[in-house]
C-alpha cells in the first residue's frame, strides 16, 4: 500500500489516505491514534540529550525553585543544580538533561521564536521582523515583552498623572503566551512560535494544536479538564507559578478580553 497513514481532518471528520482513497476513521481508531501520539510525545520529553547540569542557566533554575517554594508547590531547599533538576524530573539516569530539561533551562538556546510588527492588517509590508533564541523561560519573557511594547495604549489624564491602558489586557497576553509554550509540540522540526502584531490584532501561533484537538473554549467553560501534552515542561511551569493545574488560564484570558471589549478567536489546526 502507498500513502501516509497519519490522519488529517476535513469538514469536521478525520481520514487516512490509503491507495489514493480517503478512508474515514472510526472513533476507536482515532482514540488509539491520539493515545499513541501522547505516549510517543512523553518519550520525547524524557529522551536523553548530550548536555548536563553544567549546560543550564543556573540563576534561572534557582529563581524557579525559590518561586515554587514561595507558592507552596515544592518543598525543597536549593543545594545544587544536579539535585534540583532531579527533583523536577529533568535528568536521566545517566545524569544528562532530558529534552524537557534542556528546553526549560538550557543555555544552548534550544528554541527559536519569530516576532513581527506590521503597520496594516496584512503581511504586505512590515515595520519589524526579528528572531529570538533561548530556552522556554527566556522565550516566554521575550514574547510577552515584545507584544507589550508594540501594542497600542489609550492615555488619559487623572489629576496630574498620565494613565495608559493597553488595548489588550497585559494579563490576558501573558496567559495566552504562557499557554502557547505549555501546549505546543516541541518535537515538530522546522516549526516555530510566531508572535505578530497587526494594526487591529495580535496573533499568537505555536507548533501543534492542544493535545487531542481539544477546543480551549471547553477549558474555559469547565466542560473538560486540563489536558497536557508536555507533562514535564507543564509540571515545572506549574511549580513555578506560570500555569495552574486545572486549565483555567484560558478562562482568565477570555474573561479579561471580554471585559475589555476585545474580540478573540482560536483556531485548532491538525494534530
Segment roles from a protein language model:
Residues 1-11:
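Elongated alpha-helical scaffolds
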Residues 5, 17-191, 195-226, 249, ...:
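Active-site helix-to-loop segments that bind/position phosphate- or nucleotide-bearing substrates
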Residues 266-268:
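A short beta-strand-to-loop motif within the catalytic HATPase_c
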Residues 226-256:
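Glycine-rich phosphate-binding loop
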Residues 1, 254, 258-259:
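Conserved short secondary-structure elements within globular domains
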Amino acid at each position: 500500500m502507498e500513502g501516509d497513514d497519519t490522519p488529517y481532518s476535513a469538514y469536521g471528520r478525520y481520514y487516512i489516505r490509503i491507495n489514493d482513497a480517503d478512508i474515514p476513521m472510526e472513533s476507536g481508531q482515532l482514540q488509539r491514534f491520539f493515545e499513541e501520539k501522547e505516549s510517543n510525545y512523553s518519550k520525547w520529553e524524557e529522551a536523553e540529550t548530550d548536555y548536563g547540569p553544567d549546560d543550564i542557566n543556573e540563576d534561572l533554575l534557582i529563581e524557579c525553585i525559590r518561586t515554587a517554594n514561595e507558592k507552596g508547590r515544592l518543598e525543597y531547599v536549593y543545594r545544587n543544580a544536579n539535585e534540583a533538576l532531579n527533583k523536577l524530573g529533568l535528568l536521566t539516569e545517566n545524569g544528562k538533561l532530558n529534552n524537557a530539561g534542556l528546553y526549560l533551562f538550557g543555555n544552548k538556546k534550544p528554541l527559536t521564536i519569530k516576532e513581527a510588527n506590521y503597520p496594516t492588517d496584512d503581511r504586505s509590508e512590515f515595520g519589524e521582523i526579528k528572531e529570538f533564541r533561548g530556552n522556554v523561560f527566556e522565550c516566554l519573557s521575550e514574547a510577552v515583552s515584545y507584544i507589550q511594547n508594540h501594542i497600542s495604549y489609550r492615555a488619559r489624564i487623572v489629576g496630574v498623572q498620565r494613565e495608559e491602558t493597553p488595548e489588550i489586557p497585559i494579563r490576558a497576553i501573558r496567559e495566552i503566551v504562557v499557554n502557547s509554550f505549555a501546549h505546543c509540540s516541541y518535537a515538530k522540526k522546522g516549526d516555530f512560535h510566531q508572535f505578530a502584531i497587526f494594526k487591529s490584532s495580535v496573533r499568537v501561533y505555536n507548533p501543534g494544536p492542544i493535545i487531542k484537538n481539544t477546543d480551549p473554549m471547553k477549558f474555559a467553560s469547565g466542560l473538560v479538564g486540563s489536558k497536557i501534552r508536555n507533562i514535564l515542561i507543564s509540571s515545572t511551569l506549574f511549580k513555578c507559578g506560570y500555569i495552574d493545574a486545572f486549565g483555567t488560564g484560558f478562562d482568565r484570558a477570555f474573561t479579561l478580553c471580554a471585559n475589555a471589549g476585545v474580540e478573540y478567536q482560536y483556531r485548532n489546526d491538525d494534530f
